[in-house]
Amino acid sequence: MHIDWFVLLAQLVNFLILIYLLKRFLYTRIIQAMNEREAKIAARFDEAERLKREAEEAARVYEEKNSFLQGQEEKMLNQAREVVNHRQKEWMDSAREEVDAIRRRWIETVLQEKAAFLEHLRQRTGKQVFAIARKILDDLADTAIESKMVDVLIDRIHSLDPAEREKICSALEDSEEGAIVQSAFALFPEDRQRLTDTVRDLLGKPDAVIRYQESSDLIGGIEFLASGHRIAWSISDYLEHLEQDFDRVLHEEVRQTLPKPSGESVMPSEEQRP
């Protein structure tokens, strides 16, 4: 069985970095925020219970004072009960609305912080993995990672089926701008020439125009673009799987920690999550 040590090592480094960042930056903040929210919610419920007890005490005193009235006792007691029930319902409804509002704001805050953290983690992890991979290749193979990316792109171009090659050839004929090769870092001149020769020979277009650009949006990747056709390889492909796993773990952790009210879901469903 062939083992791709480059991919294995990159995934291992991704996992170690993820565990470290999760423990150092995110978990403590989430627990602290949840504790603060829980304290506020508990305070609201305590206030509601206090108001309820006060209302019940007021009803008891009211009933005792009016028990001496003749003829109007039942009527006044009924009025007192109605007042108490109405006030109690108002207080409980108000407390419930405030608790629900606090919970919704907390969920929105967590989701926003999670999205920002995931994006920051994705960018930072990608750069660190790319730097580590570059160092490993330099140390072990005396080969720049940019050259390896070109090798991968050339292999993917060679693996195109005839129908896909024909589509790309037609696109190049119809386009005045030619093809574009974008990479996260500048390619060496010899790698550019090697890639240019490969594309021209394989597609049978010796005069095909190929322009090279650098794009900060690519995280350790390279892509070939020709009028809507795209052939690419990028570390971000691996990071997307890592981000999905992290998102799932984070969602499960928050769902288990946050208290769930009856009849209401704490966290949004998968369709509602960003």
From Swiss-Prot:
Alphabetized CDD domains for the sequence: ATP-synt_Fo_b
Localization, UniProt: Cell inner membrane
Function: F(1)F(0) ATP synthase produces ATP from ADP in the presence of a proton or sodium gradient. F-type ATPases consist of two structural domains, F(1) containing the extramembraneous catalytic core and F(0) containing the membrane proton channel, linked together by a central stalk and a peripheral stalk. During catalysis, ATP synthesis in the catalytic domain of F(1) is coupled via a rotary mechanism of the central stalk subunits to proton translocation.
Similarity-based family: Belongs to the ATPase B chain family.
Gene Ontology MF, one: proton-transporting ATPase activity, rotational mechanism
Transmembrane segments: 2-22
GO cellular component, one term: proton-transporting ATP synthase complex
Keywords per UniProt: ATP synthesis, Cell inner membrane, Cell membrane, CF(0), Hydrogen ion transport, Ion transport, Membrane, Transmembrane, Transmembrane helix, Transport
Record-given protein name: ATP synthase subunit b 2
The protein's assembly and partners: F-type ATPases have 2 components, F(1) - the catalytic core - and F(0) - the membrane proton channel. F(1) has five subunits: alpha(3), beta(3), gamma(1), delta(1), epsilon(1). F(0) has three main subunits: a(1), b(2) and c(10-14). The alpha and beta chains form an alternating ring which encloses part of the gamma chain. F(1) is attached to F(0) by a central stalk formed by the gamma and epsilon chains, while a peripheral stalk is formed by the delta and b chains.
InterPro entries xref list: Alt_ATP_synth_F0_bsu (IPR017707), ATP_synth_b/b'su_bac/chlpt (IPR002146), ATP_synthase_B_chain (IPR050059)
Source organism superkingdom: Bacteria
A Pfam family of this chain: ATP-synt_B
Bilayer disposition of the protein: Single-pass membrane protein
